[in-house]
Amino acid sequence: MTNCEKDEEFVCISCVEEVRYSFVSHLSEALRRKGINNVVVDVDIDDLLFKESQAKIEKAGVSVMVLPGNCDPSEVWLDKFAKVLECQRNNKDQAVVSVLYGDSLLRDQWLSELDFRGLSRIHQSRKECSDSILVEEIVRDVYETHFYVGRIGIYSKLLEIENMVNKQPIGIRCVGIWGMPGIGKTTLAKAVFDQMSSAFDASCFIEDYDKSIHEKGLYCLLEEQLLPGNDATIMKLSSLRDRLNSKRVLVVLDDVCNALVAESFLEGFDWLGPGSLIIITSRDKQVFRLCGINQIYEVQGLNEKEARQLFLLSASIMEDMGEQNLHELSVRVISYANGNPLAISVYGRELKGKKKLSEMETAFLKLKRRPPFKIVDAFKSSYDTLSDNEKNIFLDIACFFQGENVNYVIQLLEGCGFFPHVEIDVLVDKCLVTISENRVWLHKLTQDIGREIINGETVQIERRRRLWEPWSIKYLLEYNEHKANGEPKTTFKRAQGSEEIEGLFLDTSNLRFDLQPSAFKNMLNLRLLKIYCSNPEVHPVINFPTGSLHSLPNELRLLHWENYPLKSLPQNFDPRHLVEINMPYSQLQKLWGGTKNLEMLRTIRLCHSQHLVDIDDLLKAENLEVIDLQGCTRLQNFPAAGRLLRLRVVNLSGCIKIKSVLEIPPNIEKLHLQGTGILALPVSTVKPNHRELVNFLTEIPGLSEASKLERLTSLLESNSSCQDLGKLICLELKDCSCLQSLPNMANLDLNVLDLSGCSSLNSIQGFPRFLKQLYLGGTAIREVPQLPQSLEILNAHGSCLRSLPNMANLEFLKVLDLSGCSELETIQGFPRNLKELYFAGTTLREVPQLPLSLEVLNAHGSDSEKLPMHYKFNNFFDLSQQVVNDFFLKALTYVKHIPRGYTQELINKAPTFSFSAPSHTNQNATFDLQPGSSVMTRLNHSWRNTLVGFGMLVEVAFPEDYCDATDVGISCVCRWSNKEGRSCRIERNFHCWAPGKVVPKVRKDHTFVFSDVNMRPSTGEGNDPDIWAGLVVFEFFPINQQTKCLNDRFTVTRCGVRVINVATGNTSLENISLVLSLDPVEVSGYEVLRVSYDDLQEMDKVLFLYIASLFNDEDVDFVAPLIAGIDLDVSSGLKVLADVSLISVSSNGEIVMHSLQRQMGKEILHGQSMLLSDCESSMTENLSDVPKKEKKHRESKVKKVVSIPAIDEGDLWTWRKYGQKDILGSRFPRGYYRCAYKFTHGCKATKQVQRSETDSNMLAITYLSEHNHPRPTKRKALADSTRSTSSSICSAITTSASSRVFQNKDEPNQPHLPSSSTPPRNAAVLFKMTDMEEFQDNMEVDNDVVDTRTLALFPEFQHQPEEEDPWSTFFDDYNFYF
């Protein structure tokens, strides 16, 4: 965002001028590092008009007030502070954070004033902690209590977006962010923008794209966003192209609804430079299709943990409300919101302020009944873009079809005249409907808002188009006549249904009433009628007091009436539009009398209608596909249905009086005859295209003609000859307990033979030659004949096998399951292409050499401990503890066979492995796992040269009694910064259980071990990986098979990393450096570099700063004697710096430092200068020495002008430079200084310094006012190493310059100044002005801090402290003079 005023989430810091460029600058930078880029520093607090400041503060999300602790809380300050509080009252959502900065005995007075104004969020500077700790506390407070709420759950999504961007080829990359309203698309896009924008030449974030384009126009919007501050107006796109041609640009278009407008926008930007990125957020996937964006990220809802955290923060709920009750309430809210951040936060804010749990529960029920306007508005904007048919389909689904089979819904809606195949896809694209597991689903909020649309159309129940609330339907249908006081019947007129009603779904679970006979008379347009009972334990009681139903609407497509109490449907009912009749447990004897038009009927279900005796009328339904008459015990015959060509399924199970079936349709797929009186099927019954016969038949002749029969289930016994099976593809004889043997089936074309559960089967003569899948689990077979070479799956789970034939020649065998074969003694060998091997619970003592292709090994409960040494193993459970502890160390050692001169080709062929074990089995293992889900390792120089890969150990906590862990895996993200300072990453996903395989019940937690040599940083020069400072960060996330994060169900509790080294095969088991509590944020190149610097010894830090400021690109031979002169060990120091990648030494002996390294060195010097000035200005003084506050009056200034040489020691006063400006007609600028004791002693002395026009070696100094304190008399350096380092650097500047002057031109790399020699006292005179100006350009810092370069040349500007420490004589000890 270019202007923070447009961002409702920015921080405004109010402060005084004195701390703006010291403490406040550090605070601002820390906020930006946390991702809060919009920070406004307001110093107008000194301005009593306060208008501009007030406007800024009112718009801010957080207002930070930095108060000077060393100033008396006078009326002036309190007035200013009151104005800040007034701004906060105008913005009730704004947070106010107070910071009391500076040591003072007036602290108690400030705290009293702040407490009086009701402010509890107060931070104070303390003697026992540094400013950096104070800054960290303030940033944490601001972020976690305000900004963090909006970004809960964003980090894992950022990783996925980043990965999606990185996978795209170089060029103009495009990513679409898609999701339902309120799911966090804009928040995620802003987070991506904040993280990535700094890496682009230009960037823009266009919020509410369609509205912005309409209001401002394309060119004006682009000029405002991409070229802020530009004077010229862009009239043509070509002008913008000329200014941004070939530049890397980041463009974010938020909330795009009109695909055509976005498409035209993007078509004009094919000239952007390679690496440009365009991100579009939309709730309509069709936008991405039209814009040609293939990489689409679907934003998922928050997991349970994140949702609860957001709810509690939004509602400001305290835990003292009762942990159990609070948990139940939060679960209900979270379950209803289903991970939608907008809904969770809105409901949380609506419940905010409710002190009692009962009040919150009541408020929540009201919110469910009438969702808040903000949520309704967000969802209704998508609804308003639909066509009329799409709206009708959406409302039908919202009111009636939640969770129904999508094919069932499509069939009904097609019968209503809609085009659901297309229109449901539109609803899915607009995030209003989802299809999961072949069922139609709506988010609970979406469903309630859809129903609210219906209820909002009219307050008259009888005129609402769709009815689903039982109480309102009962009101319309209930019989309304009764006797009063024994008098004749009195009729009370009630409102009856109208022709506006299109759908009526009545749940009778809690109802008991009489239905009036003419209840449906006026519902002429009723399409969908369903009367059902959702509670199977309740018997509904709905009666017809008159014993009749006068009519049903002729427009019905669905007639679903459970427990229908009458003997037939109304005779005047015309069912020509009916698509489905579903009337289970009815009292029907027949549907109706006579012949009806049933041309639209697709399904009829009359199951368990025990009075049904006649269904002959169904023969007229030529399009009928399903007939379900299960449990119709009085039905005696099934009519010849040969003419029903579309009939696919017939279920006559339980029709005990049916003795025969005369004719079966030719396209029948499923025929259920269990429990019938049918003993045999005639030959003409089995047709060539039958696919499945399900029945316990004693004889099925004619199977040789069934050329398309694919499944034959559960025969009691096999035929004496299997030749009648013809072209059968799948033979399933599962659980045929009486089957004892099978004949030779070598000539059959079977692909699948399932004999599972045939507990009496003890022999097989031969297998089909083309068999692919063989299931022998639970059989009594001890030996099997030669297996066919086409076999792909062999499952003998729990069988009595004792041996297997040699399987080495089975090239296609991929899965071998021998689990539970307790009698299995030997295995001769495995196929070379085997991928999955299961032998859990066997007694094998040795396992043959496993093939290279093996991916999964399940050894649960196996007695074998002599496992092979290679590759990837899963489900490694319940081995002895020693085996588990030793296996990882042994497995890592196996990579020692890789030669030292390895290549990428050899790395790609190197073994990888993984295994898992319950954590309780390795409690005594020395794995050194660290708490948390991330860990950072440091590689020393030798490791980096021979790095092969990493071994990773991850402990995952599973929920109690979690049974299905088949879908669990671990995503590992490896991050590092290359030597150019760019952040790099690689991600690999590891799954410990093969998809679709049943794994043993997991314990509470498991340790997973992975190794993959491809999981390593990319190679730099030679074999040295391109890793900056040797720091590599690993982060671990639990995922499912679709790589979706599972943090809501599983938790990574501990993790660890080991280095695989090619030279020795060792794994750095003891020397690896592990960093705990690593924040899960991207480690930038600067942060990696700073970590390396902070870990250096003090003298190595000094050496680095020397090189950063003076000796970049210099020869080592030139630098060494100069550095040695100040007692620094050059040889070891340079090696240390090179090992952590702070410098590098080229092949010709030059010290090379990249730009980011030099930048960090300058910033360190800059920061130390700030600390120096801060320390000088805030040194503790006796309170009695502080002059009392006097009335303001203008003092007369004492003016004195002197001229001194530029190298003179000066007046020995301590000055602080606060400005500089060019003087008209003068060659030299004028510097402005004030006494460093202005704020501690109230000293008003100032001076102006300018070089002489006639003699540039002379300085003209003008003194204004007198000092009110004694002149300092002694030299002193800061007690801490930071200041001493800064001082030593400053001192060396002059020395280095002098060395250059004495250098012989003929010997450029041989300095003539020996390390022990003492340069002349006036050596600084020889420092050329051009060198001085060049150095000033290279080391430019802010003008309002002490300039350490000037300190070196003008000692009179240096502070002369009172005491002395070991650093105070540093320069004198090494004979440095100025």
Swiss-Prot record:
InterPro entries: Apaf_helical, Disease_R_plants, Leu-rich_rpt_3, LRR_dom_sf, NB-ARC, P-loop_NTPase, TIR_dom, Toll_tir_struct_dom_sf. The keyword DNA-binding applies. Residues 170-421 form the NB-ARC domain. The keyword DNA-binding applies. One of its GO terms (biological process) is signal transduction. LRR repeats lie at residues 498-522, 535-553, 554-575, 577-598, 621-646, 665-688, 742-766, 768-793, 831-854. Keywords: ATP-binding, Cytoplasm, DNA-binding, Leucine-rich repeat, Nucleotide-binding, Nucleus, Plant defense, Repeat, Transcription, Transcription regulation. Pfam families: LRR_3 (PF07725), NB-ARC (PF00931), WHD_ROQ1 (PF23282), WRKY (PF03106). It is found in: Nucleus; Cytoplasm. Residues 1300-1321 are annotated as: Disordered. A motif (Nuclear localization signal) lies at residues 988-1005. One of its GO terms (molecular function) is sequence-specific DNA binding. GO terms for cellular component: cytoplasm; nucleus. Interacts with PopP2, a R.solanacearum type III effector. This is Disease resistance protein RRS1. It comes from Arabidopsis thaliana (Mouse-ear cress). The gene is RRS1.
